[in-house]
Amino acid sequence: MTYSTESLAQSDIWPATADVSTLRRKLLDLLCQLAYKEGDFVLSSGQPSSYYINGKQVTLHPQGALAIGRILLSLLPSDTQAVAGLTLGADPIVTAVSVVSAYENRPIPALIIRKEAKGHGTKAYIEGPNLPEGAKVVVLEDVVTTGQSAMKAVDRLRAAGYVVDEVISLVDRQQGGAEFYQSVGLKFEAVFTIMDLQQRYQELGN
């Protein structure tokens, strides 16, 4: 399905007050319609794959961003002081959660973790508000395969003095990421597994 302003206007506009379970069902459909593709692909890890999930097709979609913000906010521990993620995939996710948190009177700032330090100015790896040392940060990700991408964000945040003990992803490809996080003492949660997407993809007749 190709996104257009016309298709958005004709679609079922999701009310901002919809309950999280409803948003979760609608987000799954959106991921199947816009992000999930079958074919021959090579992942960022170098692994070949018979399918690909282009998360930005949904994380940058207006209704998708709203659903993501509300769903992930509901999964955050009550003592979360910030959300963060590795650029570029996590940028719209942490932003959506932060914006929604302000509307729900639970303001949580967002941090963006660079893959390489800036070559000018502060030369920082981490962009966003300065937090106190020991602040609890949850790392967010769009798709987890091996778990290595989000781990880079975890390492940068810990090096800056923050406490990180949890990673939350929109989709778990179930290719070792969850086991990896467990092995390094990180809690891991995913909104959907790849089985959820593939089953719904078939139900939608794609």
Swiss-Prot record:
Keyword Disulfide bond: no
Pathway noted in the entry: Pyrimidine metabolism; UMP biosynthesis via de novo pathway; UMP from orotate: step 1/2
Binding site for orotate: 145, 173
List of residues binding 5-phospho-alpha-D-ribose 1-diphosphate: 114-115, 118, 120, 141-149
EC number: 2.4.2.10
UniProt keywords, alphabetically: Glycosyltransferase, Magnesium, Pyrimidine biosynthesis, Transferase
Record field: catalytic activity: orotidine 5'-phosphate + diphosphate = orotate + 5-phospho-alpha-D-ribose 1-diphosphate
Cofactor: Mg(2+)
Coiled-coil ranges from the UniProt annotation: none
GO BP annotations, alphabetical order: 'de novo' UMP biosynthetic process; pyrimidine nucleobase biosynthetic process
Superkingdom to which the source organism belongs: Bacteria
Gene3D superfamilies hit by this protein: 3.40.50.2020
Any GO MF annotation of the entry: orotate phosphoribosyltransferase activity
Family: Belongs to the purine/pyrimidine phosphoribosyltransferase family. PyrE subfamily.
Protein name as it appears in the record: Orotate phosphoribosyltransferase
